[in-house]
Each structure stands twice: as structure tokens, then as C-alpha cells.
Amino acid sequence: MPVNMISKLLEKAVLPALDVAPPVKIGGPRRTSVLRNPNMEKLQKGYLFPEISIKREEHLKKYPDAKVISLGIGDTTEPIPSIVTSAMAEYALALSTPEGYQGYGPEQGHKNLRKEIADKVYPDMGIKESEVFISDGAQCDIARLQTLFGPNVTIAVQDPTFPGYVDNGVIMGQTGKADDGGRYAGIEYMRCAPENAFFPDLSRVRRTDVIFFCSPNNPTGHAASREQLRQLVELARRNGSIIVFDSAYSSYISSSSSSSTPRSIYEIPGAREVAIEVSSFSKFAGFTGVRLGWAVVPDELLYSDGVPVARDFDRVVCTCFNGASGIAQAGGVACLSTEEGRGAVARVVGVYRENARVLVETFRSLGKEVHGGGDAPYVWVRFPGRRSWDVFAEILEKTHVITVPGSGFGPGGEGFIRVSAFNSRDKVLEACQRLKSFLA
């Protein structure tokens, strides 16, 4: 019997039994019989920041000689301090010797870095090194936490907020479809606007299993007060919810305001029983390309059945992640372990903080309603009656300056743009001059 005839007979006999459709080819490329994850179809357009990169490339094709200045994506531009890069170089060089070579490290991270984070980032908060999980960045931790929670949890997010919380939830199957206004069914959107001082009315927030909360907030730049975070923790304790607190920008909270504006959720009594904190070396040490972050999962945080959340998160980390780069972790230790290292990264943060101040002054001088920029590297500017993408496009067209449309952070961002302080001082000053010429 010919081979092709045998194949056809096998398809008829086996495929129906497996309830699998055979590969198809209908006037185009051959397709597999694998069904697409239906949750991917729910996602709106592309992810925000790659979409902006596409707009930039289109603009440069139109204006090939344009000197584009990016005040868009939050990517650092200042060099990493030499005390940090020297530590990474020394670690990397040691890998070329028999004595210094190291392969896989602990999935949870090197013990010395976990201890430095517990001692230096969370002094007097009772955080143990065993509760710190080193990662390749806060955004990756958000995805791993969504894997941990699974598809059956309900989630709440600030509106506007970092889009990764929502998109990961959609991919995991935690939501329904988006309506015409961009709101996904099944997500509780906590409105954070100038009218409520960028903090939601918690008495009107529907109970959810997980609450994503970013402070200082990306994109609004608002840093929640101690009293506001006390209310948030109280809500979580009352409802039996888990807070995922994103403190990636906590180093931008000035020392003068730190007494009233916590840098960590664990400064609030009772938070250890209801909160996970994720953070990153990206924005305070310039590690956007190096990739290093961490999550804190306290021992006291338990599921409804009494199982520690940390036990399951450890399993997720061990299953999905082989640990952060040892070279990157050596840099993290250098950032925290000495006064010189801490001072060096603080000076870098100071550059961006001053850039934010210049941006705030520029927009205020133009009569614009401006928020943020004090305890965060982002400035949130309102353009009443305008659509965010239209404002973004007009500024790019007229000034060759890239911003971020506020609607990309959720429906509550419509009518705003986010302006980033992450660029060199010269370029920020040049961008401000262009904006003044256009908006005056």
C-alpha cells in the first residue's frame, strides 16, 4: 500500500479518536492544529511601549534628519556608577578562572544580596533574607505572581496604572473582554484622578482577591501617604485580600517627605499578613539593561487554607526561573553594601529628580495642569478636551519629542500625557525649549 494512502488512513482512524483537527492549508501558509490561547484575543492592540517605538520609527522615516528626544519609555540614560560596574566586571572576570567559576546559583538569589536588601531596604520592618526573592526585574515578578494566583482570582488596579498588571491578568484568564471604553470585565478599576488626590475612595471599591497598587505611581507620579496606605492595608485585612505593592520608584521619595510618605508597604502595621512587595534596581541603579529586581513574600502571608503563599511562590520561581544573573547580583550587592555604593546610586537618582523638577516648571509656566514629578520621575500633564494619542502625535510631529499617551495606562488616563525625566540634562532642557515654542 502506498505511504500516502497509509497516512490518510491513520489520520481518519487516529485523529477523530484524539478529537484533534488535522493541520490545514487553505490558500496560505500551513497551519498547525493547535488552538490559540483565547485570552490573547482579548488584548487591546499591542503592548503600549512597543507601540510607541513603532510610532517613533514611522516618524524617523518621515523625518530622517530629526533629532528625536525621548521623554517616553522609562529607560535610564545616566551611566551606571563605576563602583557598581567594577563589581560586576570583577565577578565576570572570576568566571574565567577555576577558582572563581560559578554555574547555577540559588533560584531565590544569592544569600548576600538577599541579606543586603532585607537590611538596607527594609530596616526595622522585620523582613528576613529568606523572605526576599531575587529576580530579573519587577515586571517579570508581576508575571510570575499572576501565574501563582492562577485564572480564578479577581483583581483590582489603580486607574490609570502600569499596563503590565492588566495585560498579565488578561493573558492568565482573570478577566472578560474589554468594553468600548477599554475596561475589562472582571477587573475593579480604582479611579485615581486629580479630583480624588490620586487615591481611590476605598468605600466604593468592590472586594477582589488581589489588589495591585503602585506607589509612587506610574504614570501619575503620586506617592501615597502613610494614612492612605494604612487605609489600603485595613481594606485588605477586612476583605481577606492580597496587596501586590509595586515600589519600583520608592528611591525617588525625598528624605524630607519620607516620614509622611512610606517607601514600603511594610512600614504599615499589619501589612506583612496581607502584602507582597515587588521592586527593582532598574530605576534607582540604572539596571534597565542589566535586569535585577526582587519580591518580598512574608512568612505570615497565608492562603485561605492556611498554606503559606511563600511556599507556592518558591515553587513557581524554581519551576519557571533559574535565578538572576550572578553578574547582575554582584552589581546589586555593590549598590547596597557600602556607603560609597549607596551614595553613588543616590546621585544618579538626583539627576532624574532634578530633570523632573525642570519639566514640572516648564509645563506650569505654560499654564498646564501638572501632577507628579516630586516623589517620582514622571510628570502627568492634562490636556482638557483632547485625546491622549492626538496630543502625543501632535507633540511628536511639531517638536520631535516623544511622550506617552495617558490612555495607554487605562481609561482614567485619557486626556493626559506622561512625560519621563529619564534622559540627560541637556536633552531635557532642549525638549523643554521645543515644548515651550510649540505650546506657548
From Swiss-Prot:
Going by the UniProt record, its keywords in alphabetical order are: Aminotransferase, Plant defense, Pyridoxal phosphate, Transferase
Q: Molecular function terms in GO for this entry?
A: pyridoxal phosphate binding; transaminase activity
State the name under which the record lists this protein: Aminotransferase ALD1 homolog
What this chain does, per the entry, is described as:
Probable aminotransferase that may generate amino-acid-derived defense signals and be involved in resistance to pathogens.
Q: Where does pyridoxal 5'-phosphate bind?
A: Y104, N218, D246, Y249, S280, S282, R291
| EC category | transferase
Give the gene symbol.
ALD1
The regions listed as transmembrane in this protein's record are none
Q: Which family does it belong to?
A: Belongs to the class-I pyridoxal-phosphate-dependent aminotransferase family. LL-diaminopimelate aminotransferase subfamily.
Give the species: Oryza sativa subsp. japonica (Rice)
User: What cofactor requirement does the entry state?
Assistant: pyridoxal 5'-phosphate
Task: List, alphabetically, the InterPro entries matched.
Answer: Aminotransferase_I/II_large, DapL/ALD1, PyrdxlP-dep_Trfase, PyrdxlP-dep_Trfase_major, PyrdxlP-dep_Trfase_small
